[in-house]
């Protein structure tokens, strides 16, 4: 059923959903048509598979971040920051995209903030203020929570540990199924990358997620900064599509660029001969290695930039298949150049940003690849965004 019974009370102001929840079918068709028009120069329409709708339409998000906000007059809100100008803090009391108990977590945090009026909201342009965000992650096995409070790491805005522990205890007293609580301190300095100092306050150091394809289930430990697809059921459909696109016979070598916590490679490992993962983020590599061991999978992971890995291995035997699932900015030119020198037979490109994806697919097509098939999957209902998976094959 491609509709919802009502719209969220914050629709139109919070900056989250850009189309009414009650009009999902029409908004999905609009997104699909836009994607067809965008990729028309590269692929015949009949090779674009029908978009896979999001399921469930409501309460399916496994992660959401909420922001602390404060006006110059001192009015405080916890929720979303509107995209309007001037920006406004929207005190979210309902969100149809995530488990409704997330609102209990926000309400507990609001009460704690009210009890400590000296704590100010963080203001990124000036790197001032104490409270940044609260992130709620939901496990799909026990519907339990990981909660991450992010505050400023600047000494003059630091939040004392005993105040943090008050917040922690309020959450634990609520009776909510909380698996783990983390406190992150954001360390920002001009002309330097932002880093985080993490304190594990309570419970397990990870949240459990389970994904299955072809009846095979794999368990994943997701840590505070692990990337995981935002809709667990849609993630299974993404990986199932990748498997169908590569059509493995069991003798292939598969290179998983931007492998993150190893999820794609681990789920595809039973179908190919060898899996190699490449990831730049140390925390993600640690998670990947943990998940590889957890699932008894033979997969090698390199802590390396994708460009450097491709450059270092450009003269070695080419992998049969390369799966790339890069950030929204894409692979970028130099990484793409070295990937082309590796000349894999098949490339599966997964992207949440089709504008970047088509630019890089155009380069691949110019250099001897053909875009064979395309499968859009909706992970972001009621927004303008689509996940898109394309299969490119090297012309002989």
UniProtKB/Swiss-Prot annotation:
Q: Impact of altering residue 334 to K?
A: In strain: L2/434/Bu
According to its UniProt entry, the protein's GO biological process terms are: rRNA base methylation
On the tree of life, the source organism's domain of life is: Bacteria
Q: Does the keyword Iron-sulfur apply?
A: yes
**What CDD domains does this protein map onto?**
AdoMet_MTases
Q: What class of enzyme is it?
A: transferase
Q: What is its EC number?
A: 2.1.1.-
Q: Which residues bind [4Fe-4S] cluster?
A: 8, 14, 17, 95
What UniProt keywords apply to this chain's record, in alphabetical order? 4Fe-4S, Iron, Iron-sulfur, Metal-binding, Methyltransferase, S-adenosyl-L-methionine, Transferase
Q: Name one GO molecular function term.
A: 4 iron, 4 sulfur cluster binding
**Pfam families linked:** tRNA_U5-meth_tr
S-adenosyl-L-methionine found in the keyword field:
yes
Record: residues binding S-adenosyl-L-methionine: 229, 258, 279, 325
What is the active site of this protein? 352
Q: Which Gene3D superfamilies match?
A: 2.40.50.1070, Vaccinia Virus protein VP39 (3.40.50.150)
Q: Give the family, as the similarity comment puts it.
A: Belongs to the class I-like SAM-binding methyltransferase superfamily. RNA M5U methyltransferase family.
Protein's UniProt name: Uncharacterized RNA methyltransferase CT_742
Give the source species: Chlamydia trachomatis serovar D (strain ATCC VR-885 / DSM 19411 / UW-3/Cx)
High-level lineage? Bacteria, Pseudomonadati, Chlamydiota, Chlamydiia, Chlamydiales
């Amino acid at each position: 059923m491609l509709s919802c019974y009502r719209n969220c009370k914050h629709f139109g102001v919070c900056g989250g959903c850009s189309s009414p929840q009650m009009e999902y079918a029409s908004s999905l068709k609009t997104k699909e048509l836009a994607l067809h028009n965008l990729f028309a120069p590269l692929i015949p329409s009949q090779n674009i598979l029908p978009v896979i709708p999001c399921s469930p339409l409501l309460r399916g998000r496994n992660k959401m971040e909420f922001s602390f906000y404060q006006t110059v007059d001192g009015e405080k809100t916890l929720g979303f920051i509107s995209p309007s100008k001037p920006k406004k803090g929207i005190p979210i009391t309902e969100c149809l995209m995530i488990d409704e108990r997330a609102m209990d977590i926000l309400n507990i945090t609001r009460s704690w903030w009210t009890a400590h009026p000296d704590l100010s909201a963080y203001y990124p342009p000036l790197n001032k203020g104490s409270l940044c965000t609260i992130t709620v992650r939901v496990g799909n096995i026990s519907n339990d929570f990981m909660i991450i409070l992010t505050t400023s790491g600047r000494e003059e805005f630091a939040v004392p540990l005993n105040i943090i522990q008050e917040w922690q205890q309020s959450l634990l007293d609520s009776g909510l199924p909380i698996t783990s609580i983390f406190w992150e301190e954001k360390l920002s300095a001009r002309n330097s990358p932002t880093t985080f100092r993490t304190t594990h306050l309570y419970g397990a150091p990870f949240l459990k997620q389970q994904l299955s394809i072809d009846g095979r289930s794999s368990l994943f430990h997701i840590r505070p900064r692990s990337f995981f697809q935002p809709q667990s059921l849609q993630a299974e459909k993404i990986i199932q599509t990748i498997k169908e696109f590569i059509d493995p016979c069991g003798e292939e070598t598969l290179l998983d660029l931007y492998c993150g916590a190893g999820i794609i490679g681990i789920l595809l490992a039973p179908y190919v001969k060898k899996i190699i993962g490449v990831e730049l983020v140390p925390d993600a590599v640690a998670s990947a290695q943990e998940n590889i061991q957890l699932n008894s999978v033979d997969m090698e992971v390199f802590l390396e930039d994708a460009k450097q890995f491709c450059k270092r291995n450009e003269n070695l035997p080419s992998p049969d298949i390369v799966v790339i699932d890069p950030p929204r900015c894409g692979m970028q030119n130099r990484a793409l150049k070295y990937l082309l020198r590796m000349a894999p037979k098949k490339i599966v490109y997964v992207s949440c940003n089709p504008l970047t994806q088509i630019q890089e697919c155009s380069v691949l097509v110019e250099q001897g690849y053909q875009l064979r098939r395309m499968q859009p999957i909706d992970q972001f209902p009621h927004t303008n965004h689509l996940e898109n998976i394309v299969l490119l094959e090297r012309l002989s």
